[in-house]
Amino acid sequence: HTAAADGSVKADLSVAKEMGGPGKPGTTTPEHLFAAGYAACFGGALDFVGKSHKKDASKARITCNVSIGPRELGGFGLAVKMHVEDKSIPQAELEALVKEAHEKICPYSHATRGNVDVQLEVVGG
């Protein structure tokens, strides 16, 4: 079980199947929580960047998939696939906004850079 210090988030946890755990139904994993936090943070960063370029990216759908697996040096590592979709913004413009949010604004992107493989998939209009 885990909970935020202020009680705003509570979750029953299980160990992911990839790590030899049961992956129990009705529970979550630390990877799920990381994915939710990263997606939420990235959404805020994208909205911030959009506003600075007079674009409304507040309705972008952001899906983050975090996987876990063995590392070459031992132990386990994470990999992230971030899917960003907003058909109201042209593809090239959305790609530029996502790139700026990822490279300059998002704290999760800063924290993972050089440590976690992050792949961005962008679908604009």
Residue locations for each model-derived region?
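Extended beta-strand/beta-hairpin segments
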Residues: H1-A36, G43-G125
